[in-house]
Amino acid sequence: MNNTYPHPIIAREGWPYLGGIFIVTLIVHAAAGLGWAWPFWLLTVFVLQFFRDPARTVPTQANAILSPADGRIVAVEQVRDPYADRDALKISVFMNVFNVHSNRAPVDGTVQQVQYFPGKFVNADLDKASLENERNAVVLRRADGQVVTSVQVAGLIARRILCYTKVGETLARGQRYGFIRFGSRVDVYLPLTARPRVTIGEKVSATLTVLAELD
């Protein structure tokens, strides 16, 4: 996996959408003028902001668990991690359609498992979405042996999960490893000893926000 994603301002996942709507907009504008074309220009601007993908600076704290996504915290609770088969602290980030949708590694680690599960498409803001919706789990093991699980969860509108990593690869904190189109949720399962640094309702930014700290 390429560790040096070039951050071309607009996510590569959006290039086909942007190219298509831009061509249609130019055709309508040329044929009918701005009066007919302005809704298409607005749509073009929306697509631009939706697929924006700015570079992020990784915090220096070695024990920090970084947010894998932009969004809002909707859960901080002790649960069972069904992917790593353990009790864990779960922190969930809900992404709406206006958030950046790139997903980034929360820790440095080696990929132990990549598990895809088909499922429903209920509102990702609901707790039941974590285990009922379509999802993709990546289990990471840090050099110190601690395990962190990051789960991309599809939502009511988002029905396309993209994951670019595989078992055996090493991810660096903040490294881009996936994308979910049109808003959704990412669940992060941490060791029970992790100390949360966010609260429900708090807005977070991928890589920039520290979700928790490990011992």
Swiss-Prot record:
Q: What is this protein called?
A: Phosphatidylserine decarboxylase proenzyme
Q: Which organism is it from?
A: Ralstonia nicotianae (strain ATCC BAA-1114 / GMI1000) (Ralstonia solanacearum)
Gene Ontology CC terms, in alphabetical order: plasma membrane
Q: Which residues carry this modification: Pyruvic acid (Ser)?
A: S184
Q: State which Enzyme Commission number(s) the record gives.
A: 4.1.1.65
Q: How does it assemble?
A: Heterodimer of a large membrane-associated beta subunit and a small pyruvoyl-containing alpha subunit.
Q: Which gene encodes it?
A: psd
* Cofactor(s) the protein requires to work: pyruvate
> What does the UniProt keyword field contain?
Cell membrane, Decarboxylase, Lipid biosynthesis, Lipid metabolism, Lyase, Membrane, Phospholipid biosynthesis, Phospholipid metabolism, Pyruvate, Zymogen
Instruction: Give the pathway.
Output: Phospholipid metabolism; phosphatidylethanolamine biosynthesis; phosphatidylethanolamine from CDP-diacylglycerol: step 2/2
Q: Where is this site: Cleavage (non-hydrolytic)?
A: G183, S184
Which sequence ranges are marked TM in the entry? none
Q: InterPro entries under this entry?
A: PS_Dcarbxylase (IPR003817), PSD-A (IPR033175)
